[in-house]
Amino acid sequence: MQQVLRQEIWGRLNERNQHFMAVLVGPEGSGKSYTSLKIAELVDPTFTAERVMFNPADFLEQLQEWKAAGETKGKMVVVDEAGVGIGTRSWYEKDQIKLNKVLQVIRDENMGIIFTVPSLKDLDSQARRRLRAYCEMV
């Protein structure tokens, strides 16, 4: 399983000039965060805790820094409990609008993003349409 995940996701980011967006869904304590961190570490050997984001503003700020330094290709990012920062109820907020614009063009950056949420409904509909993988934790 590890080899398949690494080969498929790493290949998308580093060989096929694509992005990767996934979501891990499940109740509190189901292992979403741990699993997302392990996947990110497996795919991207340079992954560190500094690439775990908890709100859109942090993610947007960090993305701008990576883009300016030309350091986006192949990077994995975990947006933990994404529903708190980018849920459907905040669709009209300034950060939400900015984040949706970033998600529209993120494919050009060849990055991997893993969201964790309690329910898929907690993730904005625009983000859901861009997902490449869905995993439900029980």
Where are these regions (language model features)?
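Conserved nucleotide-sensing/catalytic segment adjacent to the nucleotide-binding pocket
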Residues: 49-115
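Hydrophobic anchor at the beta1->P-loop junction of P-loop NTPases
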Residues: 22-24
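A short helix-turn-beta junction within AAA+ P-loop NTPase domains corresponding to the substrate/partner-engaging
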Residues: 125-138
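Conserved lysine of the Walker
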Residues: 32
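The conserved Walker
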Residues: 27-28, 91
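Hydrophobic positions on the alpha1 helix immediately C-terminal to the Walker A/P-loop
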Residues: 35
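Active-site signature of alpha/beta-hydrolase-fold catalytic machinery across serine-
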Residues: 38, 42
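N-terminal pre-Walker A segment at the start of P-loop NTPase domains
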Residues: 1-17
